Swiss-Prot record:
This is Glycine--tRNA ligase. Transmembrane segments: none annotated. Catalyzes the attachment of glycine to tRNA(Gly). Belongs to the class-II aminoacyl-tRNA synthetase family. One of its GO terms (molecular function) is protein dimerization activity. Keywords: Aminoacyl-tRNA synthetase, ATP-binding, Cytoplasm, Ligase, Nucleotide-binding, Protein biosynthesis. Its EC number is 6.1.1.14.
């Protein structure tokens, strides 16, 4: 099992994730994504969007505002019900979520005793003001989830897209929660990104579609992101764990170095959200669906798939990370990312920094850069350059040597196996495309 300290070290050293405001001492639970981190996030988002929107003719996209009218959060139940229970240790003053610790045992921080305060409720929403006057009339919240922006746009999307039940609305965006405790690197933070889809169905079809989306989402992690199946599992919520809006819920959990934790939730939200907004807005017809074939009118039920993008980044790094002992006794660190997710698809190396080789290398770079994100490197030994690319997950390295001048061939080295092939420059594009398309993951890594 990979160690969390190895992931954090790699993330900072190679430019995936940096501590936010580090030059000023850092801000707890806040992280900046570096050059490789933004590429990995972008690639995961791209695959999620493709799997949700492009591969389903009845799912469309939305990008709703972070700031919305505060009535929306009162209607959704977040103002009154979106809270965690917290306790403080009276000895060391540390604060904990009550459901994260055993209150009958010693404080996990100071170990002195179980001298805790009584649990008290703590609302997780960030409140701020819009305008020049800070009073109750200018209060707004940073959204704690992206879902409500979808629900209040139900009628807009339905009418403008000419959709029929069942259909879905997908969205990727930032959400904010004033977490009592931020921990485990980028896993639990106050600012994060969600990839959510709300699927609207006839009430009588809710169970059928709930089962469909459970399996669909698990397949996404295994078949698209190539996450190890033995590190994924379903976990059902019992009645005491359900959110205020949910009738049923399953989590997809991944085995992180700190244990199994949620990366995506699949929820049967019933008609709770649409009914609440119909009531609070006093516009019931806006949230009602009229089936023109059956003449039936009803408020649709909703199945939600809610994945954490930032958690998916951490999961992907943990799952891809490996350390290998080589035959010469050396060790290499490899990120076995699927090529679709790798920040760079190709690295191009002139064997030495001589103009006759760098000119060819630059020409190949320009020929391929429209279709592949490429890293160009002409410093250091070839062995060191290979190791640098292994660490960041680049699947293919292309070396231009003196034979290239003679026969227009290059050496293509594959990351996982370290095998090398001579390929004609004119065939390089199609070769890399085919290799990515036919990539097979070894889950026994």
């Amino acid at each position: 099992m990979v160690r969390m300290e190895d992931i954090i070290s790699l993330a900072k050293r190679k430019g995936f994730v940096f501590q936010s405001s580090e030059v000023y001492g850092g801000l707890s639970g806040a992280w900046d994504y570096g050059p490789l981190g933004v590429e990995l996030k972008k690639n995961i988002k791209k695959e999620w969007w493709k799997s949700m929107v492009y591969l389903h003719e009845n799912i469309v996209g939305l990008d709703s505002a972070i700031f919305m009218r505060p009535e929306i959060w009162r209607a959704s139940g977040h103002v009154d019900g979106f809270s965690d229970s917290m306790v403080d240790c009276k000895d060391c003053k540390s604060r904990f979520r009550a459901d994260f610790i055993d209150l009958s045992k010693n404080c996990p921080n100071c170990k002195v005793g179980n001298n805790f305060t009584s649990p008290r409720s703590f609302n997780l929403m960030f409140k701020t003001h819009i305008g020049v006057v800070e009073d109750s009339s200018s209060e707004v919240y940073l959204r704690p989830e992206t879902a409500q922006g979808i629900f209040v746009n139900f009628r807009n999307v339905l009418d403008s897209s000419r959709l029929k039940i069942p259909f879905g609305i997908a969205q990727v965006g930032k959400a904010f929660r004033n977490e009592i405790v931020t921990k485990n690197f980028i896993f639990r933070t106050c600012e994060f990104e969600q990839m959510e889809m709300q699927f609207f169905v006839h009430p009588k079809q809710i169970d059928e579609w709930f089962c469909y989306w459970q399996q669909n989402r698990m397949n996404f992690f295994i078949e698209t992101l190539k996450i190890s199946p033995d590190r994924l599992r379903f976990k059902a919520h019992d009645s005491t764990q359900l959110a205020h809006y949910a009738k049923a819920a399953f989590d997809i959990e991944y085995e992180f170095p700190f244990g199994f934790q949620e990366v995506e939730g699949i929820h049967n939200r019933g008609n709770y959200d649409l009914t609440q907004h119909a009531k609070f807005s006093n516009k019931p017809k806006v949230f009602e669906y009229h089936d023109l074939l059956t003449k039936e009118k009803y408020v649709p039920y909703v199945i939600e798939t809610s994945a954490g993008l930032t958690r998916s980044v951490l999961m992907t790094l943990c799952d891809a990370y490996s350390e290998e002992e080589l035959s010469d006794g050396d060790k290499r660190i490899v990120l076995r990312l699927h090529p679709k997710l790798a920040p760079y698809k190709i690295a191009i190396f002139p064997l030495v920094k001589k103009v006759e080789l760098t000119e060819i290398a630059r020409r190949i770079y320009m020929e391929l850069c429209d279709d592949f994100h490429i890293f160009y490197d002409d410093s250091g030994t070839i062995g060191k350059r290979y190791r640098r690319q292994d660490e960041i997950g680049t699947p293919y390295c292309v070396t231009i040597d003196y034979n290239t001048i003679e026969d227009e061939t290059v050496t293509v080295r594959e990351r996982n196996s370290m095998t090398q092939k001579r390929i004609f420059i004119n065939d390089l594009y199609s070769y890399i495309k085919t290799e990515i398309l036919n990539y097979k993951e070894d889950f026994n890594k």
